[in-house]
Amino acid sequence: MARYIGPKTKISRKFGELIYGKTNKSFEKKKYPPGNSSSRNIKKTFYSTQLLEKQKIKYTYGILERQFLKMFYKASKKKGIKGEILLQLCESRLDNIVYRLNLSHSRPEARQLVSHRHITVNGKIVNIPSFNLKPGDKISLKEKHKHKANKNKLLGSDWLSWDNEKMIGIFKYIPNRNQITENINEKLIVELYSK
């Protein structure tokens, strides 16, 4: 699967919830899945629910299959609950932190900000969206783009902080499962990959 650049509403309708973070009028009108009406009556198997959950997390964070598989293997090598560690790895990506700090309106926009070299981590420019942050890292926009920063509420709660005077965000600690707001059942993903 290559990077998806098609209609975002179709993806949101497929899962029955907003995936890309923005509210969408066309999603509000048609909350049923896209496609033929006869295809909606087919009974879902357990495998299909597992697959949909995996696709949901990949679309939510903008990750392709190979990179997601590497993240799963990395999570399975660490001590703890695999699914929770997998979500923590997704949440600690630079593009996601830029979105959570409210420096962008969506994750694809955050990804573009990072790849266009507008974001600095600890004073150094980083242009890799999948860059994993460590607790204590400081994230900010480059000097000439600091006026564009949204001074609104953070989308991540306790584990991020934003200083309006210095225009610097701090990744305080890795969030636990209760602090991750995404509606993802990580147990189904672990079961799918553990076959």
Curated annotation (Swiss-Prot):
Keywords: Ribonucleoprotein, Ribosomal protein, RNA-binding, rRNA-binding. GO terms for cellular component: small ribosomal subunit. Gene3D superfamilies: Ribosomal Protein S4 Delta 41, Chain A, domain 1, RNA-binding S4 domain. Belongs to the universal ribosomal protein uS4 family. HAMAP family: Ribosomal_uS4_B (MF_01306_B). Coiled coil: none annotated. Disulfide bonds: none annotated. The gene is rpsD. PANTHER family: 30S 40S RIBOSOMAL PROTEIN, SMALL RIBOSOMAL SUBUNIT PROTEIN US4M. One of its GO terms (biological process) is ribosomal small subunit biogenesis. One of the primary rRNA binding proteins, it binds directly to 16S rRNA where it nucleates assembly of the body of the 30S subunit. This is Small ribosomal subunit protein uS4. Residues 92-152 form the S4 RNA-binding domain. SUPFAM superfamilies: Alpha-L RNA-binding motif. The keyword Ribosomal protein applies. One of its GO terms (molecular function) is structural constituent of ribosome. Part of the 30S ribosomal subunit. Contacts protein S5. The interaction surface between S4 and S5 is involved in control of translational fidelity. CDD domains: S4. The lineage of its organism: Bacteria, Pseudomonadati, Bacteroidota, Flavobacteriia, Flavobacteriales.
